[in-house]
Amino acid sequence: KKCADIDQDCKTSCDCCE
């Protein structure tokens, strides 16, 4: 999954923080 913003729901919606 990809988030709209890496600083928005990244740590709660998907793994785009890595």
Curated annotation (Swiss-Prot):
Tree of life domain: Eukaryota
Protein localization: Secreted
GO cellular component, one term: extracellular region
Main location group: secreted
Disulfide bonds: C3-C17
Keyword vocabulary terms for this entry: Disulfide bond, Knottin, Neurotoxin, Secreted, Toxin
Coiled coil regions in record: none
GO molecular function: toxin activity
Tissues with expression: Expressed by the venom gland.
Record function comment: Neurotoxin.
Written domain comment of the UniProt record: The presence of a 'disulfide through disulfide knot' structurally defines this protein as a knottin.
Family membership noted in the UniProt record: Belongs to the neurotoxin 03 (Tx2) family. 06 subfamily.
UniProt-recorded name of the protein: U11-ctenitoxin-Co1a
Organism: Ctenus ornatus (Brazilian spider)
Lineage per the UniProt record: Eukaryota, Metazoa, Ecdysozoa, Arthropoda, Chelicerata
